[in-house]
């Protein structure tokens, strides 16, 4: 559209740009390369990656696309988004962006999503790390969750009330315990989606 001064692409967990498949024998195009190969390119690309060897791969890929404006941010996704990228994209800038957030685990923070939402200029696609959530916080008993996993989930969820979606109190032979709700995995994903819709109403 005529009023738009730029349409930018943000990849919060960029990886190498061409990761191996699970069989470790073939390579597939990762999200950065897919975005760069689009027929109608974005005006700017923001790739965030925290692992050094993956950053080197992204730098190599950058040389393959000399006509693309590519910025690589070495570091934590939340920090890079909140401090370096999101502030450059207020709605008043007349620039718009799409952010693809596909974390390997529970690194994403709700505060980051909230800051993105407040711009009203960035469309977000999130791949919720369901496997990481199931592995780390959907234990048989709430007391089995490690402090580190609990902290990660608190940051991802934005509050501590996610436990009410996963655990309920039941009487056992050893007294009352907070135990996992049978369908809590699906319920947790549904509730997270609903919370996203509250801050991204459109």
What are these regions (language model features)?
Residues 81-92, 114:
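Short amphipathic alpha-helix with an adjacent loop that forms part of the alpha/beta core around
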Residues 140-202:
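A conserved mid-domain beta-alpha-beta active-site/ligand-binding segment of alpha/beta enzyme cores
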Residues 106-118:
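A short, conserved alpha-helix within the catalytic core of class I
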Residues 51-54, 103-108:
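Acidic, metal-coordinating catalytic cores used for nucleic-acid/nucleotide bond scission
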Residues 1-84:
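SAM cofactor-binding core of SAM-dependent methyltransferases
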Residues 120-135:
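Conserved beta-strand signature within the Rossmann-like core of class I S-adenosyl-L-methionine
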Residues 38-40, 116-120:
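Short, conserved loop/helix-junction motifs that constitute active-site signature segments
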Residues 7, 95-101:
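Generic beta-sheet signal
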């Amino acid at each position: 559209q005529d009023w738009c001064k730029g349409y930018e692409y943000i990849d919060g967990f960029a990886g190498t740009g061409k990761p191996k498949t699970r069989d470790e024998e073939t390579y597939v195009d990762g999200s950065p390369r897919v975005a760069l190969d689009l027929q109608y390119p974005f005006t700017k690309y923001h790739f965030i990656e925290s692992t050094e060897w993956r950053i080197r791969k992204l730098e190599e890929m950058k040389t393959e696309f000399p006509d693309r404006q590519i910025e690589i941010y070495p570091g934590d996704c939340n920090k890079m988004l909140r401090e370096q990228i999101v502030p450059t994209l207020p709605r008043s800038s007349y620039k718009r962006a799409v952010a693809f957030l596909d974390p390997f685990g529970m690194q994403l923070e709700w505060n980051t999503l909230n800051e993105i939402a407040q711009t009203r200029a960035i469309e977000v696609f999130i791949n919720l790390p369901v496997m990481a959530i199931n592995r780390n916080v959907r234990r048989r008993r709430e007391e089995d969750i490690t402090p580190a996993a609990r902290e990660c989930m608190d940051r991802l969820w934005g509050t501590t009330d996610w436990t009410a979606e996963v655990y309920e109190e039941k009487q056992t032979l050893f007294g009352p315990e907070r135990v996992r709700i049978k369908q809590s995995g699906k319920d947790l994903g549904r509730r997270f989606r609903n919370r996203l819709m509250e801050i991204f109403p459109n």
